[in-house]
Swiss-Prot record:
Metal-binding recorded as keyword: no
Annotated ranges, domain S4 RNA-binding: 90-153
Organism: Microcystis aeruginosa (strain NIES-843 / IAM M-2473)
Coiled coil: none
UniProt keyword list: Ribonucleoprotein, Ribosomal protein, RNA-binding, rRNA-binding
Pfam (any one): Ribosomal_S4
Protein task: One of the primary rRNA binding proteins, it binds directly to 16S rRNA where it nucleates assembly of the body of the 30S subunit. With S5 and S12 plays an important role in translational accuracy.
Annotated region (Disordered), positions in chain: 23-42
Superkingdom to which the source organism belongs: Bacteria
The protein's name: Small ribosomal subunit protein uS4
Keyword Isomerase assigned: no
Length: 202
């Protein structure tokens, strides 16, 4: 399944608030479509699927990528669900978003893909790059790159900077000081249900 490029508010209406996907809120609180307001009891599978979809759409990863992250999280020490969230949060596109350099993760991904972002002084155009403690995230020393980020900063996606990051608005330089803590993950998600969803598939 490839990355979603359709109407974002339809997804928000179905899955709830996704801070990484869009800053807009759905006016209607029920799912889109003819049967959007149906109140039938959902199966456990449907609930797990919904949590998995939240993760996919919020971070903008494909099904294939998410499976890779689940496998990687399983091999790591610690809670699989928490490690999975950390892997997604420490992606470069998400880090750029959390630093306030872009209003959404798709916007941050575009900045990265178009070569506007540097890591430790070098241009990195791979959105899935895993940021590590000590990494310095900056903006390419070109007027266009600087202007793009400054404009984005006028409309930040999330108000608070996570505790593992620091950012200097004057120099447009951020630093990764550690790994994100669970309490700083902005998405409302039950990661255990995602792990359960993949338990027989991965």
């Amino acid at each position: 399944m490839s990355r979603y490029r359709g109407p974002r508010l339809r997804v928000v209406r179905r899955l709830g608030e996704l801070p990484g996907l869009t800053r807009k809120n759905a006016r209607r609180a029920y799912a889109p479509g003819q049967h959007g307001q149906a109140r039938k009891k959902r199966s456990e599978y449907a609930i797990r699927l919904e949590e998995k979809q939240k993760l996919r759409f919020n971070y903008g990863v494909s099904e294939k990528q998410l499976i890779r992250y689940v496998r990687k999280a399983r091999r790591a020490t610690g809670s699989t669900g928490q490690v999975l969230l950390q892997l997604l949060e420490m992606r470069l596109d998400n880090t750029v978003f959390r630093l306030g350099m872009a209003g959404t993760i798709p916007g941050a991904r575009q900045l990265v893909n178009h070569g506007h972002v540097t890591v430790n002084g070098r241009v990195v155009d791979i959105a899935s790059y895993q940021c590590r403690p000590g990494d310095v995230i900056g903006v390419r020393n070109q007027e266009r790159s600087q202007d793009l980020v400054k404009r984005n900063m006028e409309y930040p996606g999330l108000a608070n900077l996570p505790s593992h990051l620091e950012f200097d608005k004057n120099t447009l330089v951020g630093k990764v000081n550690g790994v994100v803590e669970r309490e700083w993950i902005a998405l409302s998600i039950n990661e255990l249900l995602v792990v359960e969803y993949y338990s027989r598939k991965v």
